[in-house]
Regions:
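Helical scaffold of the NTase/Pol beta-like nucleotidyltransferase catalytic core
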Residues: 1-23
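Generic structural signal for well-ordered secondary structure
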Residues: 2, 50, 70-73
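Short alpha-helical segments and helix-capping/turn motifs at coil-helix boundaries
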Residues: 7-8, 25-28, 73-76
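Short secondary-structure boundary/capping segments within folded domains
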Residues: 13-15, 31-35, 79-80
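Residue-level preference for short coil/turn positions at secondary-structure junctions
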Residues: 18, 35-37, 73
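Catalytic metal-binding acidic patch
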Residues: 26-62, 85-91
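Conserved NTP/Mg2+-binding pocket subregion across the NTase superfamily
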Residues: 60-153
Length: 153
């Protein structure tokens, strides 16, 4: 269902210097999505304001029927409805979103919503590891947090 989207995310992650990493979160990442579930994508970018205001990247994923910007604290989301009936929510955050001190919302997303899905298992090419001492290793790419759940507790 989302195979082409994941392929395009990988291309964007590899070719866009402003994007530090891309996370698949929510029901698709957990493998609990049902028909009609949206795809939740977190984009950690050093140029958040450009991505939010330009928005042209959303057209890379299909023909846009409608889009809406939602502000949720440190995350600005662009919710997009595509002609193929897919709905994608792009959550765009600064690198500080995954800072040393996690707020409860960020912690919930990272522990419950970034779990490897069998749909995307073989598409990962980079990773993030947040150690208990607060050191974070962030690499460009799509990342999955299945092995990191215990670290965040």
């Amino acid at each position: 269902m989302y195979k082409q989207v994941f392929k395009k995310l990988k291309e964007i992650g590899q070719h866009t210097s402003d994007i530090e990493c891309i996370l698949i979160v929510g029901s698709v990442a957990r493998g609990t999505n049902i028909m009609g579930s949206d795809l939740d994508i977190m984009i950690i970018s050093s140029n958040k304001s450009f991505l939010v205001h330009d928005k042209s990247f959303i057209e890379y994923f299909g023909i846009v029927c409608n889009s809406k910007i939602e502000c949720n604290g440190t995350c600005t989301s662009i919710r997009v409805w595509y002609q193929d009936e897919n709905e994608i929510e792009f959550g765009i955050v600064d690198p500080s979103w995954i800072s040393l001190t996690l707020d409860s919302g960020t912690k919930k997303v990272l522990t419950e919503g970034c779990i490897r899905s069998s749909l995307i298992r073989n598409m990962s090419f980079c990773f993030i590891i947040r150690l208990q001492n607060g050191i974070a290793l962030i690499m460009v790419g799509i990342i999955y947090m299945d092995m990191c759940t215990a670290i965040f507790n």
